[in-house]
A protein has these predicted regions:
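C-terminal leucine-rich, beta-strand-based interaction scaffolds used for sensing/assembly
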Residues: 2-3, 262-344
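Walker A/P-loop nucleotide-binding motif
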Residues: 35-56
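A short, basic N-terminal segment
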Residues: 1-40, 331-334, 342-344
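Conserved small helical "lid"/interfacial subdomain of P-loop NTPases
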Residues: 193-221, 227
């Protein structure tokens, strides 16, 4: 039997824990006769399971003949990609849209005003015809960034909604990237789009998963689950290593730390500002009380609150206990102590 866990980002593993509540909210809304929202933004720290969550949504609708699911890349021409994919899918499913198109992405990607207008017109024409055939189109865009392709697509999507096309959109990415996109003056309508912050996985659910896969005691499964802190990538790493070696937890820690550092923590740390790092560093030394953190860094309550909110939204710290901040990522303090130099 193959290892049911994976170390590959974005790959849906055999053994994974569904976020039924959060994903279900999107599906429930989209399935309404008159949906209250047609756009959702999914935010989460690196390794939080954004891509797998999008795959769950895509799988749900791909099995429904009424829906057409398009998974698009944020770093390519989204309008051209949508035209190409919708044309291909329509031909594959023998949907006669009355279109005389023989265009590939390369032909549609010339960045000239007339070509852009033509692509947008073609896409609206396709959506109109799909609407008349009772079809719905779900656009899924992962790793969202604030670039020209995304801005043009988002602007057009607003038009699709006002023209009552049966279109739906789920975009996922890091919190900062989503915020940057929403702050665009021409895209203020995105502020009304609900944001779903991917929460840590349930420790009991992780415990149950480990017990179902491995022949281990309840106490060992709980110990493993608690080590992950509900971080999906850590859940996969620990399960993968346990499957490969069947060593006890203590022997797995060095490789567990190494995988977290290489594939997640180095990048997460590099994206923190100077004050972000100082706050996280102080917390990593065992100072959890917000008053003590402020005292250590000589900063005002207002400033700490601003950074506290941002670090929580990024999924780096946990502020669920009033007056305290702790690290949300498993063994992040070990990484900071060993590899990160911070001057207070």
């Amino acid at each position: 039997m193959e290892n049911p866990f994976t170390l590959t980002f974005g790959q849906k593993p055999t053994e994974f824990i569904s976020r039924a509540n959060q994903i279900g909210k999107i599906i429930h809304t989209f399935d309404m006769e008159n949906p209250s929202n047609k756009i959702y933004m999914v935010a989460g720290v690196r390794g939080s399971g954004k891509t797998v969550s999008l795959a769950e949504i895509a799988d749900h609708y791909s099995s429904n003949d009424q829906w057409i699911v398009l998974r698009l890349s944020a770093d390519t021409d989204l309008i051209a990609g949508a035209v190409s994919e919708l044309t291909r899918i329509s031909q594959f499913h023998d949907l006669d849209l009355g279109l005389n198109l023989n265009l590939g992405i390369a032909e549609l990607s010339v960045n000239k005003t007339n070509d852009s207008l033509e692509k947008e017109s073609i896409l609206r024409n396709i959506l109109e015809k799909l609407k008349n055939k009772g079809k719905k189109v779900l656009f899924i865009i992962d790793e969202i960034i604030n670039n020209s392709y995304v801005k043009v697509f988002a602007s057009n999507f607003q038009i699709y909604i006002t023209q009552n096309y049966p279109v739906y959109l789920v975009m996922a990415g890091l919190f900062d990237n989503i915020s940057n996109l929403q702050n665009e003056k021409s895209l203020t309508f995105l502020y009304r789009a609900p944001k779903i912050f991917l929460e840590p996985l349930s420790i009991p659910a992780i415990t149950t998963s480990y017990r179902s896969v491995f022949d281990i005691s309840p106490s060992e499964a709980v110990e493993m689950a608690k080590l992950t802190k509900g971080y999906p990538f850590a859940f996969q790493i620990l399960g993968y290593l346990k499957w490969e070696t069947n060593d006890d937890l203590e022997k797995l820690l060095p490789k567990f730390d190494e995988e977290l550092i290489i594939y997640a923590y180095e990048k997460i740390w590099s994206e923190l500002s100077e004050l972000d790092r100082k706050i996280v560093y102080v917390i990593s030394t065992g100072v959890y009380k917000t008053g003590e953190i402020r005292e250590k860094l000589s900063i005002s309550p207002q400033l700490l609150n601003t950074y506290r909110k941002r670090l929580m939204e990024r999924g780096v710290v946990n502020g669920s206990v009033r007056g305290e901040l702790t690290l949300a990522l498993p063994r992040f303090e070990a990484y900071i102590e060993m590899y990160c130099e911070v001057e207070l």
